[in-house]
Amino acid sequence: MSAVPLRNGKAAASGVRQVTVLGATGSIGDSTMDLLRATPERYQVEALTANSNVAGLAKLAIEFNARFAAVADASLLGDLRAALAGTGIECGAGEGAVIEAAARPSDWVMAAVAGAAGLKPALAAVDRGATVALANKECLVCAGEFFMQRAADAQACILPADSEHNALFQALASGDRAELTKVIITASGGPFRTWAAADIEQATLAQALKHPNWSMGQKITIDSASMMNKGLEVIEAHWLFALSPDEIEVVVHPQSIIHGMVEFSDRSVVAQLGAPDMRIPIAHCLGWPDRIVGRAAALDLTKIGQLTFEAPDFARFPGLRLAYDALRAGHCATTVYNAANEIAVAAFVKEQIRFGAIARLVEETLNAWIRAGNLAPLGSADDAISVDHKARNLAATLLPQIAAKAS
């Protein structure tokens, strides 16, 4: 049984909901707290976490009268205690404290801790059967098979919190899984949508960071420019909705108004539209199975004027093709894909490789991993973290030769 509820079969939520926000001071956390701030009568904050932003975490914990606050950096425990002195708010520091925050009793958890560090806290929330709004890609890209199984076993409810998968989640409610023929994930095309391949190869960091529609962090903006981010979303959709690679299509939609579509057997296509504002999918998750009053601007289609669509160019954006290759390879290949991309993006930011070499490093790492016969199923979070670590080391080893070829 899927942990993602494809039909709204739950009764409407009643009473005050206890919520936990993992990654409260990041961009997703900020949007979540903005929505909580607007409806204080509906929610009580149980726990908040942050990576290292003690001041921001303490401010939020006091504002929302949280019962527990945790900072991932263990060395900052003294700072957090000082910031919360006299408030009565419990606090902790280190990985264990973040996991404790996730394990504390609450009805709803926003899992927005970035990177592989978010996997164990998300699992702690899943294991107690919580409703989890999932914004951490690594849970699915690096560990999707066992993560979704754990969620199903614990009868946890997984709500997709990013815009594309939340759009699919909403559209899928229009039919049964057996009636689905395909899902369509939209992509803006990024800043290089109309660029020639030779120009993309030589693109600078400043150019890669000029996203036409979304305001995001550095890593995800670079991933959008390479379309690696869309590749990661294809992998996430595979695990969230139990889809084969052939059932997942990517369409370039420069306006970023339609975020996802679902085609059913009668050839009806159901789409979800909204302004490019992360508060929209988060509000859907926060209110589910009800709807709450949103904070994003209303959509005015007359001002947009037109919605256009293009096929993605796999030759100019090979990162997207590689995601499908990794899915078809199976098991831990998607973990390797993600790890190699993280190493490649970091190298690009440091000007060690050209933009075009990002996908080449990912491809070489994937191929080397598969040739070595290292594909194996992942049975635990530690397995996923181990593969992630080894794949990063492999990508780092291959980096000099990729850089040399481009010079």
UniProtKB/Swiss-Prot annotation:
A GO molecular-function descriptor: NADPH binding
Pathway: Isoprenoid biosynthesis; isopentenyl diphosphate biosynthesis via DXP pathway; isopentenyl diphosphate from 1-deoxy-D-xylulose 5-phosphate: step 1/6
Signal peptide: none
EC number(s) on file: 1.1.1.267
Catalytic activity, as annotated: 2-C-methyl-D-erythritol 4-phosphate + NADP(+) = 1-deoxy-D-xylulose 5-phosphate + NADPH + H(+)
Needed co-factor(s): Mg(2+); Mn(2+)
Annotated 1-deoxy-D-xylulose 5-phosphate binding sites: 137, 163-164, 188, 211, 224, 229-230, 233
Keyword ATP-binding: no
Protein known as: 1-deoxy-D-xylulose 5-phosphate reductoisomerase
Organism this protein belongs to: Rhodopseudomonas palustris (strain BisA53)
